[in-house]
């Protein structure tokens, strides 16, 4: 499943396709999707397992400031000076713009190169020169070059894990001696959590399930993991 799916849709899918287990591979910040998947499994009595991305150790990167959510990150950014690059997508951009008092700090948004993403940046009041439309994840060297080009003094990113390129951003910022604002993942009480695809497969077979009867709730960022689990 790689599209928005409400509870009723997921329940119908489970019933119509004889699903016996759900593997939740969604983005760490897709909390509502995970909650819906767990609820659907509770309602139908089938197995649920969360494939969680590795958590980064912020202590490994100098200059990292952790915040519990987007609101806290926006308040922190509003107190900074210079140029802050936001690498958080477009959904929460208005929070950062609303918290800012005046033109400082300068906000530069790095977003996906989709017309809708760019349009939403412009609608928020960002100037074209403050919009970087690129699809990552990128290497440390690429991030370094981008931060230097835009004169970035702080970068804001989500705790998306290595697969989302968070480590490369933090490392690039650390090498340049600039601040990093790291937004922590939402805390959910997952019923069962696995760290690797192999652990997921072992769990499924221990539950008497096979990947053939398993629904994979996924997003594009974790697609390679899902392909592995189908072998």
PLM regions with names:
Residues 42-49, 105, 175-179:
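A short helix->loop->beta-strand "cap" motif at the edges of active sites that frequently abuts
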Residues 20-21, 83, 153-154:
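Structural motif
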Residues 82-130:
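Anionic-ligand binding region
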Residues 11-73:
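Glycine/small-residue-rich loop that forms an oxyanion/phosphate-binding "nest" at active or ligand-binding sites
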Residues 122-145, 149-154, 159-176, 181-183:
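A C-terminal functional module that forms or caps the active site or interfaces directly
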């Amino acid at each position: 499943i790689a599209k928005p799916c409400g509870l009723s849709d997921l329940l119908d899918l489970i019933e119509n396709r004889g699903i016996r287990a759900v593997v939740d591979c969604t983005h760490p910040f897709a909390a509502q999707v995970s909650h819906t998947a767990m609820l659907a499994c509770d309602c139908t009595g089938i197995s649920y397992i969360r494939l969680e991305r590795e958590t980064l150790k912020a202590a490994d990167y100098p200059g990292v400031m952790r915040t519990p959510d987007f609101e806290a990150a926006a308040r922190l950014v509003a107190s900074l000076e210079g140029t802050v690059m936001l690498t958080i997508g477009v959904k929460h951009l208005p929070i950062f713009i609303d918290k800012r008092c005046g033109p400082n700090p300068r906000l530069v948004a790095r977003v996906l190169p989709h017309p809708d993403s760019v349009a939403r940046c412009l609608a928020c009041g960002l100037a074209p020169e403050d919009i970087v439309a690129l699809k990552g994840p990128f290497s440390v060297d690429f991030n370094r070059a981008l931060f230097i080009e835009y004169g970035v003094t702080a970068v804001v990113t989500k705790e998306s894990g290595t697969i989302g390129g968070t480590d490369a951003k933090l490392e690039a910022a650390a090498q340049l001696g600039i601040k990093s604002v790291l937004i922590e993942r939402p805390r959910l009480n997952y019923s069962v959590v696995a760290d690797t695809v192999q652990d997921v497969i072992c769990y499924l077979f221990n539950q008497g399930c096979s990947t053939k009867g398993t629904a994979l709730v996924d997003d594009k960022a974790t697609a390679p993991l899902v392909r592995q689990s189908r072998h």
